[in-house]
Amino acid sequence: MHTTGDGLVVPENEQAYRSVVDRAGHGYLLRQIFVARAGHCTFTPAETITALHVRLNRLDTGHWNVPSPADLNAEAASLGALNVAPPAFTSYRPAPYLRPFDLPGEGRFLFG
């Protein structure tokens, strides 16, 4: 889970991470969820619990069933007092990671 307006650890890192996971052949294990908010890890408690439910469902069923942002927002909203701000799950595709990064153990640089 990542905020779209994170200036400390930019969301483009998620695109770089996906590239590494995909090249390792494990893309089927990775799901990325984004929250439309500024700041680093500025998730509400309700958003955090909702994302945890998605992960727990994956462990229980062996399958990813990531609901739409609207469904995630509805689940978070149902948690009442844990919403210190309106739920803000969103569809988001990070921009390409423009800096080369090294894939550990392979001694080569990758570009997103």
Label every PLM stretch briefly.
Residues 1-112:
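C-terminal His-loop and adjacent cap/lid subdomain of alpha/beta-hydrolase
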